[in-house]
């Protein structure tokens, strides 16, 4: 393709067109674009950008361009990218820096060419006003507009896309009375995970062909008034945006939170969800009731399923050691942050060599897998099975120093400073580990969120085991290795099926016992505190009853709760159920007091900084919630909800550090961490934070005159500290003060400080995982049942077959709560103190199981088959709600 520059007339700046030649031959690319601009016949592109002309670009008038491509198949389309409207905010350090990538593509052959607009700094309503000319095949080509937020720290954030077919576009006609105007296109997500909003304002028209102005004018007059951009049926699916969503069912509303995430509000059931509902998904009242009955275990189950599952065969080599830097407790001091000794190559190499020596001496469990053969039988016959068994990890590989958790070792560097090696995770730290660390953090990812186990798929028996049937029909197992028999299935000890065992924490136990002893028993209060409530109005009724108490000490009396229209005496079980139900209401984002945090786990709660816009009496409600939380701790009950770690730190008046940000918002943490480890001067950051409210962006100064203060290497620690204070403390200071006022009316503030933030969470909310081995080990049997009874074998087999949610629901059915105490089922409490989980033989096989939540007892009829027990147990769990005989 060639042109004569000398014949082109002198043009004004507005008439200058930049023509992008074929970059396949010249190897060029548009400035700032990360996609190579290539033009392949029959296509071309021109960008109206006179300020960035380069030597290889050739200037044309409109007539010369059109004459160059005057044929029956191709057309020249003029694309004007005008502006963006109400874009989503993705830049956590300020307003977004959007640009548009315009891609011409063929659904059959792929991308033909791509150009990029300039970047508009710090705007959610950018104005580009850039024009581009493309030579296209109207019936075959499409144009994809992608909006991105330029990010100098990480990859650019996606803000939305518009996919436009070219065949219905109108043709320009200068003789028309009414000129062609812009159109606003809704920005669409790339996938269901994309968070986008706003519009892209575009103007797209064909240039008229030479000698056919009248014909094109007629076509334009016909198309322009009703110009609607439609999807071409045969377009490439990977470049198409999703179809327009169907209307929301009646009673639903679409909203966006302060983080720009779209969620949906059901005003009939007063619930929120992330998934867009459809009319087909609209549930009946009965189905909504079933969902409400299932909701008590939903939080724990969702939290486990949302985590990534690692394969069990993912072995690590000695070289895959991670170096953990010093805790951020000192990042705000005047001294420079120091890394632990493992950051020094000589120490790291020495540790790796030491581990490698041990692996060589005793065998590497990740690579040494001897093959053993064993004959074992079942009722279906015998077979010979080759079992690949891993070499067990030898204790010498996990040395443990005195006073440290298992697998931890204390060492000293060359300067005599002590540091600690965690051989479990292969990390080092300056901080001395404690025994009371959150046990759930030690659980491998591949052991969480297990799918249900099929009754015939518990896996093969261990080597040397055989299954046989007794003369009375009971199944027993023979261990030929030690020549012993037992009734219990050895596969039920498999931790991958039963769930992780919680480590016993004697430190926490001593703290808890001390805490219970120090809680003062009031003598000048009534014997009991009565509450008569309606299930349908449990939040309002509870609020009026509890906030109507002038003297908070009355709330320390024995709780006596009655639900309207239900029979039963409350010996503790109904009170525990009330704590579960009121938790579900108090922490429901529908009411605007709390919101989901910005973690990958979207169900961890934090206080909504804009709660005052949702409820004028929000501070009174936060005091009420504080009182309820204090009542739960005082009476030894549990709340059904987990909060972000800074919430518990604020209760303990502890400093919130950068490390606490990691579990709440990983992107924010990464950006602040980058600032901490690099010189941020070139970013031109200021001591300000952009906050979006009702579609408007507001600037908040982190300190007086912050908009004029540039973040530099000298003041970056102050900047990080102020950002963290604004993110977690300043915005919710009034709400948190009201919550603590209510909580400390029942629990002394000094007494609660004996716990750390992890222990405080477990004190208020209990464990989040159910360990079936621990559950079974601390279960008692009555009235003819025993561990070796056939019905009990079926019962525990049913528990193993349940997924995490079902196990939680069974636990709530029997105990009245979806949580268990910190130290597991050994410290399960009933109405009169410690009360073990108990299974008692009761009734006839035609009865459903029943529960006594006050005494943690399950009345289980002697069913005649496993299937019958499974069906009846499922039915009881699904349909129970305070019926007669269950207290």
From Swiss-Prot:
Residues annotated as catalytic: 854 (glycyl thioester intermediate)
UniProt domain comment: WW domains are involved in recognizing PPxY motifs in substrate proteins. The WW domains mediate interaction with LITAF, RNF11, WBP1, WBP2, PMEPAI, NDFIP1 and PRRG2.
Linked residues for Glycyl lysine isopeptide (Lys-Gly) (interchain with G-Cter in ubiquitin): 847
Pathway this chain belongs to: Protein modification; protein ubiquitination
Known tissue expression: Ubiquitously expressed. Expression is highest in lung, kidney and brain.
Gene Ontology terms describing biological process: adaptive immune response; blood vessel morphogenesis; cellular response to UV; DNA damage response; endocardial cushion development; establishment of localization in cell; immune response; innate immune response
InterPro entries: C2_dom, C2_domain_sf, E3_ub_ligase_SMURF1, E3_ubiq-protein_ligase, HECT_dom, Hect_E3_ubiquitin_ligase, WW_dom, WW_dom_sf
Keyword presence, Nucleus: yes
Gene symbol of the encoding locus: Nedd4
GO cellular-component term (any): chromatin
Protein name from the UniProt record: E3 ubiquitin-protein ligase NEDD4
Positions of the C2 domain: 54-180
Post-translational modification note: Undergoes 'Lys-29'-linked auto-ubiquitination at Lys-847 and serves as a scaffold for recruiting USP13 to form an NEDD4-USP13 deubiquitination complex.
Keywords: Cell membrane, Cytoplasm, Isopeptide bond, Membrane, Neurogenesis, Nucleus, Phosphoprotein, Repeat, Transferase, Ubl conjugation, Ubl conjugation pathway
Region (Disordered): 297-319, 362-384, 396-440
């Amino acid at each position: 393709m060639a042109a004569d520059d000398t014949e082109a007339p002198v043009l004004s700046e507005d008439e200058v067109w930049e023509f992008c030649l074929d970059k396949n031959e010249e190897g060029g690319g548009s400035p700032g674009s990360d996609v190579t601009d290539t033009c392949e016949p029959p296509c071309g592109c021109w960008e109206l950008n006179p300020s960035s002309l380069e030597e290889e670009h050739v200037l044309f008038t409109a007539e010369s361009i059109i004459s160059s491509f005057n044929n029956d198949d191709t057309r020249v389309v003029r694309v004007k990218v005008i502006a963006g409207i109400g874009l989503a905010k993705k830049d956590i350090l300020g307003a977004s820096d959007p640009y548009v990538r315009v891609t011409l593509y063929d659904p059959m052959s792929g991308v033909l060419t791509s150009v990029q607009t300039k970047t508009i700094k710090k705007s959610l309503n950018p104005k580009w006003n850039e024009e581009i000319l493309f030579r296209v095949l109207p019936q075959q080509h499409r144009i994809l507009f992608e909006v991105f937020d330029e990010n100098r720290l990480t990859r650019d954030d996606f803000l939305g896309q518009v996919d436009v077919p070219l065949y219905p576009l109108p043709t320009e006609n200068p003789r028309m009375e009414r000129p062609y105007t812009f159109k606003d296109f809704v920005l669409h997500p790339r996938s269901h995970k994309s968070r986008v909003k706003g519009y892209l304002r575009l103007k797209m028209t064909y240039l008229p062909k030479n000698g056919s102005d009248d014909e094109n004018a007629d076509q334009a007059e016909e198309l322009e008034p009703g110009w609607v951009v439609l999807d071409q049926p045969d377009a490439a699916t990977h470049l198409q945006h999703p179809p327009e969503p169907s209307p929301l069912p009646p009673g639903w509303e679409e909203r966006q939170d302060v983080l720009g995430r779209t969620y949906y509000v059901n005003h009939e059931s007063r619930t929120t969800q992330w998934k867009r509902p459809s009319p087909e998904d609209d549930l009946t009242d009965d189905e909504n009731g079933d969902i409400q009955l299932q909701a008590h275990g939903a939080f724990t189950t969702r939290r486990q399923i949302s985590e990534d599952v690692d394969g069990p065969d993912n072995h690590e080599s000695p070289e895959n050691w991670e170096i953990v830097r010093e805790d951020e407790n000192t990042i705000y001091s005047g001294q420079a942050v120091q890394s632990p000794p493992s950051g020094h190559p000589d120490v790291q190499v020495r540790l790796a060599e030491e581990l490698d020596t041990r692996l060589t001496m005793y065998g590497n469990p990740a690579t040494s897998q001897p093959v053993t053969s064993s004959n074992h039988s079942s009722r279906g016959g015998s077979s010979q099975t080759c079992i690949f068994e891993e070499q067990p990890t030898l204790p010498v590989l996990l040395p443990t120093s005195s006073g440290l958790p298992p697998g931890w070792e204390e060492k000293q560097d060359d300067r005599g400073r002590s540091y600690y090696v965690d051989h479990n995770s292969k990390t080092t730290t300056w901080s001395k580990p404690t025994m009371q660390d959150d046990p759930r953090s030690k659980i491998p990812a591949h052991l969480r969120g297990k799918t249900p186990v099929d009754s015939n798929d518990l896996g093969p028996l261990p080597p040397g085991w055989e299954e046989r049937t007794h003369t009375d029909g009971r199944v027993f197992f023979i261990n030929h290795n030690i020549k012993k028999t037992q009734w219990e299935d050895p596969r039920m000890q498999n931790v991958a099926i039963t769930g992780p065992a919680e480590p016993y924490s004697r430190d926490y136990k001593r703290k808890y016992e001390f805490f219970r002893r120090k809680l003062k028993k009031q003598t000048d209060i009534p014997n009991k505190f009565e509450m008569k409530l309606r299930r349908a109005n449990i939040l309002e009724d509870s609020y009026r009853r509890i906030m109507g108490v002038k003297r908070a000490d009355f709330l320390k009396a024995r709780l006596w709760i009655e639900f309207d229209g239900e029979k039963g005496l409350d010996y503790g079980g109904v009170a525990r159920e009330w704590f579960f139900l009121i938790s579900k209401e108090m922490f429901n984002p529908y009411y605007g007091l709390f919101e989901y945090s910005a973690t990958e786990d979207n169900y961890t709660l934090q206080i909504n900084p804009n709660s005052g816009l949702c409820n004028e009496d929000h501070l009174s409600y936060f005091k009420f919630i504080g009182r309820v939380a204090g009542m739960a701790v005082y009476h030894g009950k549990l709340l059904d909800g987990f909060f972000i770690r800074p919430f518990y730190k604020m209760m303990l008046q502890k400093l919130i550090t950068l490390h606490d940000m990691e579990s709440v918002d990983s992107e924010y943490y990464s950006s602040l961490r980058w600032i901490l480890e690099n010189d941020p001067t070139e970013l031109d950051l200021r001591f300000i934070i952009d906050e979006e409210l009702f579609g408007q962006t507001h600037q908040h100064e982190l300190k007086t005159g912050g908009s004029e203060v540039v973040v530099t290497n000298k003041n970056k620690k102050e900047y990080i500290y102020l950002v963290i204070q604004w993110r977690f403390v300043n915005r919710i200071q009034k709400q948190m003060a009201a919550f603590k006022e209510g909580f400390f009316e029942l629990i002394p503030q000094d007494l609660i400080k004996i716990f750390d933030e992890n222990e405080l969470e477990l004190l208020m909310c209990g464990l989040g995982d159910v360990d079936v081995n621990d559950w079974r080990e601390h279960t008692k049997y009555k009235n003819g049942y025993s561990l070796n009874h056939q019905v009990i074998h079926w019962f525990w087999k049913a528990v193993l077959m349940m997924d995490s949610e079902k196990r939680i629901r069974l636990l709530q059915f029997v105990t009245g709560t979806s949580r268990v105490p910190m130290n597991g089922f050994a410290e399960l409490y009933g109405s009169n103190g410690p009360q073990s989980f108990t299974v008692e033989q009761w009734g006839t096989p035609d009865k459903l199981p029943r529960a006594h939540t006050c005494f943690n007892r399950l009345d289980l009829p002697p069913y005649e088959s496993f299937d019958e027990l499974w069906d009846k147990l499922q039915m009881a769990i699904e349909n129970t709600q305070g019926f007669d005989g269950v207290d």
